[in-house]
């Protein structure tokens, strides 16, 4: 299988606060990127899965969308 760059966008609620997030992951499939999102936000911000709302998951092509990647070191995986 081939590794792909996925972008996960959404928002999370913690108490009365609501914050938006955009995470970039290298994963084999879309479901893995969603799982990593829950894992990272849960451990770093102490959020439950029900507090995290994923709005959009899409794949970036590292060759075409080089300017959209937040860190050029992601290209080292391809």
From Swiss-Prot:
One of its GO terms (biological process) is translation. Disulfide bonds: none annotated. The keyword RNA-binding applies. Keywords: Ribonucleoprotein, Ribosomal protein, RNA-binding, rRNA-binding. It comes from the Archaea. One of its GO terms (molecular function) is large ribosomal subunit rRNA binding. InterPro entries: Ribosomal_eL20 (IPR028877), Ribosomal_eL20_dom (IPR023573). GO terms for cellular component: ribonucleoprotein complex; ribosome. Pfam families: Ribosomal_L18A. HAMAP family: Ribosomal_eL20. Part of the 50S ribosomal subunit. Binds 23S rRNA. This is Large ribosomal subunit protein eL20. It comes from Nanoarchaeum equitans (strain Kin4-M).
